Amino acid sequence: GLHYGDIFLGNIGGGDHYQHSVMGDIVNTASRIEGLNKHLGTRLLVSAEVIDRLGGLLSRELGGFRLKGKTSAIVVHELVSRLGEADGKQRDGCAVFAEALAAFRKRSWDEAAEKFRACMEYLPGDEPSSFYMKICERHKTDPPDETWDGVVAMDAK
């Protein structure tokens, strides 16, 4: 997982044992983003802060997540392809996923689930779509309260 921000970098220790290391909330958040890969079935996730600084890449927003141990949400993207190498199915799949995510945020569970299913026609076996389809099914029977902000809370790393 990739995130952007200030870190502390240096040597820690004393005597005969020093360890070169990085510290800071950015490092912890990047680690949490990395852990999100196993839940979403993805390989490379990055924060919106990274996307804002990159060019020439096709990415898709996978939504807002409140990562374990964090109080504020972070928007996460999947890096899909270099723009020049992206095929029509990848582009169309990303567009349909964006529509599905918008419906999800509006609490339109049936519409969102239908669009996530449609996304899988462009991106067969798309695990982020499956992840959200399960949440849509759960929210249809047990909807979140009125304070829900469209963010997925992750209880595990």
Question: What is the meaning of each model-derived region?
Answer:
Residues 7-9, 36-111, 117-119, 123-145:
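Cytosolic regulatory/linker segments at or just downstream of nucleotide-handling modules
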Residues 8-34:
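Catalytic-core segments of nucleotide cyclases and related cyclic-nucleotide turnover enzymes
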Residues 18, 67, 148:
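Short clusters of hydrophobic/aromatic residues that line enzyme substrate/ligand-binding pockets
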Residues 20, 29-32, 41, 130, ...:
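A generic signature of intrinsically disordered, low-complexity regions enriched in glycine/proline
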Residues 145-157:
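Intrinsically disordered, low-complexity, charge-biased linker/tail regions
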